[in-house]
Amino acid sequence: MIRLGEKQILNVVRIKDFGIYVGDEEEKVLLPRKYVPEGTRIGDSLEVFVYRDSSDRLIATTEEPALTLGQIGLLCVKEISKIGAFLDWGLEKDLLLPYKEQTVQVRPGKSYPVALYIDKSKRLCATMKIYDYLATDSPYTKDAMIQGIVYQVNPNLGVFVAVDGKYHGMIPKKNVHGQFRVGDKVQARVVHVREDGKLELSLRERVEFQIDKDAAVVMDVLESYDGVLPFSEKASPEVIERELNMSKAAFKRAVGHLLKTKKIQIDQHKIRINVEK
């Protein structure tokens, strides 16, 4: 059986000037001549990907698609049309992302995470609604570092991440610092593996590793203020978040570290770079 949207190994059953047919005598699909390996003969087995051409006919290719049925990938928008956006997925015919499958407004030249599915008309399409395509059986444990792609941003809950393009992950609101958009690539740490297998993430490393990075951020901001920060560790969480993109707890740890190493001093509710020798 020929499977739409999947890579499969099919036998060569007929050879024509314009290409070859692969499959069997009852069900076969055309592999255009330009994709036929040199020296191919009847009976040979070829790995092909099956999709539909511009006339909606089943067609085979030996080119490598960016994703196959049910997989998630980060694809770039080539153009916008009346029916949706067309994505570059490595094949001659671009992949349609219908408007109803878009979760945010997409723009040409930008990349977004999508999954490949078959619509009601038996055509391959892309969807940005990838939640149901993600799995919960990841190999990751607490404190593991992961790579992921942001697929949803919810101001009340946090940032949803497709870990490795396969697994459920989320950065809870309390761990979100800075702005994120759908399609952003992130590196994060697993802080908790939930009972259902979903991963709770943080953009910050463990405290003992993160403190030096936070201290460096504080010093950079101090220098941007000509060496005097107009607030101290007693400032509101909102001010600290706005100025340094970190929590108040992280800021206090960084300030304490800098005080201990005598790189700063605090006076009159201000933080200064320590210029004393």
Where are these regions (language model features)?
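Single-stranded RNA-binding regions, centering on S1/OB-family and related RNA-binding modules
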Residues: 1-277
